[in-house]
UniProtKB/Swiss-Prot annotation:
Name the record gives this protein: tRNA (cytidine(56)-2'-O)-methyltransferase
Class in the EC hierarchy, top level: transferase
Entry's localization field: Cytoplasm
Organism this protein belongs to: Methanosphaera stadtmanae (strain ATCC 43021 / DSM 3091 / JCM 11832 / MCB-3)
Reactions catalysed: cytidine(56) in tRNA + S-adenosyl-L-methionine = 2'-O-methylcytidine(56) in tRNA + S-adenosyl-L-homocysteine + H(+)
Enzyme Commission number: 2.1.1.206
Amino acid sequence: MITVLRLDHRLGRDTRITTHVCLTARAFGADKVILSGEHDKHIIESAQKVVENWGGDFEVEYQKAYRPVIKEHKQKGFEIIHLTMYGKHVEDVVPTIRDNNRDKLIIVGGSRVPTDVYEAADWNLSVTNQPHSEVAALAICLHYMMDGSELKTVYDDGKMQIVPNNEHKEVIKNE
């Protein structure tokens, strides 16, 4: 199981980026996103609508405080992975992480990540040591963790399904 924890969501200010964290997590193979910070029912509803329309078992839930989420997952044996530009290079350590068969909690930062998150993590991973989008970091990390298999995932239980086509858009609508 791969769960993504989005730290300190802020209403209005973070809506678009947090929505993209959820969409990216789902598309790249995560099972769940937990949002911390300010409650935003619209993001949760939006993610549920994507699952309803496009399929899969993905879910989004809200927990105001992130510390209990990290503690609970650590107690359950999850490997805690924090995405940060200050960490070890993702490509150097993901094979070790991928191959140990533990459930994963991937932490994606918000405005400013407190020191205790770095300390709680089993791994502080970077996708480059340069500032960039947490969405890009999550996508690349999940891509490495899934060993590329997520790129061909097909969900048969959605209302819609894209048929890859080089010449035009093709969408099958399932009743």
